[in-house]
């Protein structure tokens, strides 16, 4: 069965691409995240959408690599669970496509090898 979006009345929408405009998720990130966020306040709510595309911009000096991980929020336990991670080995613009399936997600910086770096990430849902 094809995955379809459900409207606010519980009625299936036609299986068409209905992407959102890009919105800011994180900006000015200049250090590895010390831990998971305390709550889901700064996360991306993907309710009603299957995928989330992160458009990631990385700048830096002495840059070798930067690793990000997708976190998934478990609302019953009020905890984050780690998903897949990806390592970038160059600065510039990168895209990361996440199979979110309606979850609440967060892009966490887990490692960096650079003298300095800055990360910004927009997201678009579809």
Regions found by a protein language model. Name each.
Residues 63-79, 120-122:
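Short, surface-exposed beta-strand/strand-loop-strand elements in extracellular ectodomains
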Residues 3, 31, 37, 43, ...:
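Tryptophan-centered short beta-strand motifs
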Residues 1-35, 55-57, 82:
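Extended, low-complexity segments enriched in Ser/Thr/Gly and acidic residues that occur primarily
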Residues 50-56, 99-117:
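Noncatalytic modules at the cell exterior or secretory-pathway interfaces
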Residues 57, 71-73, 110, 124:
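A generic structural motif
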Residues 79-98:
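An anionic, turn-rich surface loop/hairpin at beta-sheet edges
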């Amino acid at each position: 069965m094809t995955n379809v979006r459900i409207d606010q009345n519980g009625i299936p929408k036609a299986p068409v691409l209905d992407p959102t405009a890009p919105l800011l998720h994180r900006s000015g990130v200049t250090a590895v995240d010390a831990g998971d966020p305390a709550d889901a306040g700064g996360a991306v709510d993907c309710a009603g959408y299957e995928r989330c595309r992160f458009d990631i911009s990385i700048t830096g000096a002495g840059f070798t690599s930067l690793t990000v991980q997708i976190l998934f929020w478990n609302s019953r336990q009020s905890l984050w669970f780690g998903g897949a991670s990806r390592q970038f080995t160059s600065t510039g613009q990168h895209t990361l496509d996440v199979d979110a399936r309606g979850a609440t997600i967060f892009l966490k910086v887990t490692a960096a090898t650079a003298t300095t770096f800055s990360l910004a990430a927009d997201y678009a849902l579809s």
